[in-house]
Amino acid sequence: FEYMNNNFKENINFPNYWIWNGFKICWSVAGEDNKVPIIFLHGFGASRKHWRNNLEYFAKRNCASYSLDLIGFGDSDQPGIRQIGKLNNEIWSNQVKDFIAQVIRPKNSRKVILIGNSLGSLVALTCAVKLEDQIAKVIASPLPDQIQENKKSKTKKLSFKKFQDKFIRI
């Protein structure tokens, strides 16, 4: 893995880059590494810039605020179907899981707060199930329709049920 940092006190227009599975992923940060990590996840058709007004706000409140462009969005690589296949929640949640392991964990062992908007909400919830012991809270608003479609899935119900106490409803 590679990690290229331009500035710690982030200017959203001068982002950081991280190489994930051979793809360049763009991300921003505000705040100090040792503070409570928050990852902001954008919705479909958006980018990390969706959260530009939130990063500094939370950084001033003792948080290390991160926002990243999910692969296929914003300034991250836009791989074709031949390179990666279909982009989906599984790929994006693995991207966030690896971001936590490779970018945040070397500097910070605190539990992470995930905040998602629409598609980002689904990614946050899926990542939280995968990293149950590393996630403090999930804030998801609004949830995409895919959550409604998966209501009949017994495995999904059990996975999300055991994480329910960490889920903040808005």
Where are these regions (language model features)?
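Active-site glycine-rich loops that stabilize anionic/oxyanionic intermediates
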Residues: 35, 43-46, 118
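Alpha/beta-hydrolase active-site loop signature
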Residues: 45, 70-74, 145
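Conserved hydrolase catalytic core segment
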Residues: 106-150
